[in-house]
């Protein structure tokens, strides 16, 4: 558990917890769980340059933000943050699956699954992000599929947002025309 559910290959605290769970406790499932309205995600997207030590931690999310900015920039701020949260979950599942701890466990034939979920703080639902890995092969496949799905959803949301803006502009024009007509009468 950390700010923005990050799995960084130099974070010895995170990796030691994972190694103990996998090698000693023989756990079968690991869940990477982000949440909507995440302050870490919002901070990474912000323009504030220096938040102290947390700025270094959030650089990984800023990289993700810049990597997918072409699709995220068209979304409303709320949708943008939630989409980045979902992308981050997929990315962290991938990072964990690429760690030597998990790869060694899979190579030894351990039954170990990594799941990517998002907790929606508005309604309390856990949403499976469709990125679940039980081997190196499934990691690659589900990661690519999850990213493709998120890009598709972002494009749909972007088109919907653009359409809604056009409708709002038309309504405003009609209201202005009606107001002018009322004044003229």
Question: For the regions a protein language model found, what residue spans apply to each?
Answer:
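Divalent-metal-activated hydrolytic enzyme cores
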Residues: 4-28, 39-185
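Ordered, amphipathic secondary-structure segments that act as subunit-interaction surfaces
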Residues: 30-36
């Amino acid at each position: 558990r950390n700010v923005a559910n990050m799995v960084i290959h130099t974070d010895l605290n995170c990796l030691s917890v994972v190694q103990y769970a996998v090698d000693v406790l023989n756990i079968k499932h690991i869940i990477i769980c982000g949440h909507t309205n995440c302050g870490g995600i919002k901070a990474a997207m912000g323009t504030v340059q220096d938040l102290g030590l947390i700025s270094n931690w959030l650089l990984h999310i800023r990289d993700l933000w810049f990597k997918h900015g072409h699709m995220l920039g068209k979304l409303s701020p709320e949708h943008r943050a939630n989409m980045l949260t979902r992308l981050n979950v997929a990315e962290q599942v991938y990072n964990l699956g690429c760690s030597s701890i998990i790869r060694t466990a899979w190579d030894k034939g351990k039954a170990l699954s990594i799941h990517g979920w998002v907790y929606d703080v508005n309604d309390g639902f856990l949403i499976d992000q469709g990125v679940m890995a039980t081997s190196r092969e499934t990691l690659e496949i589900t990661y690519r599929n999850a990213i493709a799905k998120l890009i598709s959803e972002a494009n749909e949301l972007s088109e919907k947002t653009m359409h809604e803006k056009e409708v709002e502009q038309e309504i405003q024009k009609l209201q202005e025309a009606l107001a002018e007509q009322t004044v003229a009468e």
